[in-house]
Amino acid sequence: MGFITKAIPLALAAASVINGAEIMETRAGVQTLADKYIVVMNDGMTDKDFDSHRSWVNRTHRRRLIRRGAKAMGGMKHTYRFPTGLKGYSGHFDEQMINEISKRADVKYIERDARVQINAIEQQDNVPSWGLARVGSKEPGGTTYYYDGTAGEGSTAYVIDTGTDIQHEEFEGRATWGANFVDDMDMDCNGHGTHVSGTIGGKTFGVAKKSNVVAVKVLDCNGSGSNSGVIMGMEWATKDAQQKGADKAVANMSLGGAFSQASNDAAAAIAQGGVFLAVAAGNDNVDAADSSPASEPSICTVAASTEQDGKADFSNFGQVVDVYAPGDSITSAKPGGGSQVLSGTSMATPHVAGLGAYLIGLGKGGGPGLCDTIKQMAIDVIQNPGASTTSKLINNGSGM
């Protein structure tokens, strides 16, 4: 499998309706987290009503523990308040408590929390990369990256991943630590996030060589995390970007899994907040319509191409794919210094996030509309892109 974060196979089947609230059902074989759920509130809920609902949940949960001798559950853990209005929470509840929550008229739906993890398909040190040259040229086989000297200056890229080695020489002091929603180690002990960050803003490997990089850690040293933790990272990035200027921000999510309405809604909230979001299509060689957050239409979904301008054999495809970008045997930074070669739609996606940052530096505007700009600039070269899939490969418009 490709080096993309993947929920082992988490797929949305039917949605059952219990007294007004949907409890999303998952197919057999899903690796859900025992007794852990994500609850999403109705659209337009006020902060006051949300606080009232949360108080009711906490009171009811405590009473259950005391009166009924219910087995110990952690109750509510994370609360989500996206600036665009999406509200919800996640926590550890037994079935009876979830049934009580589902009866509430202010609940939109409930989804089982699930595990996410990353899988590498190849790794080789110190091999020349080709992706940058391809982004800056209209013909394959080049060895030079042509780009404007602004190089994304003034833009900020939020890398929602395993963290970033912010001390790596590639970042020249432009990388900072943002937030951690998975463990107590503010470092990239996996390597995936540093590689992604290097492709966006590294001085050698980056598409936008002067952009700032912010590490948002949602996956641990084993590349494992949860949908609920990823959503926390998405919320934090949205709020931080809005405080600093969303029109100067891009976000990268080289992760995903099978369909999750909660993940899609959170991705849509990032876009609604004015931040350009690039997401990996997935590495299962299937239609990305069943993947999340890749299937969210308001974001920029990226498939992976080869050096010969073909579809990478692992890459997902389909109508939800917006563009192709180099994703096979890509060289970028690794924690502790130096570089490594990785493949996957995880590697394609930061080329697009980096191009978004690059265009911001050129004064082309920001926000989710950048995806349309990138598609307009793309070149029609991908061979055998897959059923109902674009054949457009990204290009930075340098004219070479």
UniProtKB/Swiss-Prot annotation:
Record GO biological process: proteolysis
Family: Belongs to the peptidase S8 family.
Domain Inhibitor I9 residues, every copy: 36-118
Protein name: Subtilisin-like protease 7
Residue ranges annotated for the Peptidase S8 domain, each copy included: 129-400
Entry GO CC: extracellular region
Chain residues in the propeptide: 21-119
Enzyme class per UniProt: hydrolase
Superkingdom assignment: Eukaryota
Residues with attached carbohydrate: N58, N222, N252, N396
Function: Secreted subtilisin-like serine protease with keratinolytic activity that contributes to pathogenicity.
Pfam families named among the record's database cross-references: Inhibitor_I9, Peptidase_S8
GO MF annotation list: serine-type endopeptidase activity
PANTHER family in UniProt: CEREVISIN-RELATED, PEPTIDASE S8
Gene3D superfamilies per UniProt: Peptidase S8 propeptide/proteinase inhibitor I9 (3.30.70.80), Peptidase S8/S53 domain (3.40.50.200)
Chief localization: secreted
InterPro entries on file: PCSK9_ProteinaseK-like, Peptidase_S8/S53_dom, Peptidase_S8/S53_dom_sf, Peptidase_S8_His-AS, Peptidase_S8_Ser-AS, Peptidase_S8_subtilisin-like, Peptidase_S8_subtilisin-rel, S8pro/Inhibitor_I9
UniProt entry tagged with the keyword Protein biosynthesis: no
Active site: D161, H192, S346
The EC number(s) this enzyme carries: 3.4.21.-
Keywords for this protein: Glycoprotein, Hydrolase, Protease, Secreted, Serine protease, Signal, Virulence, Zymogen
Subcellular location: Secreted
Signal sequence segment: 1-20
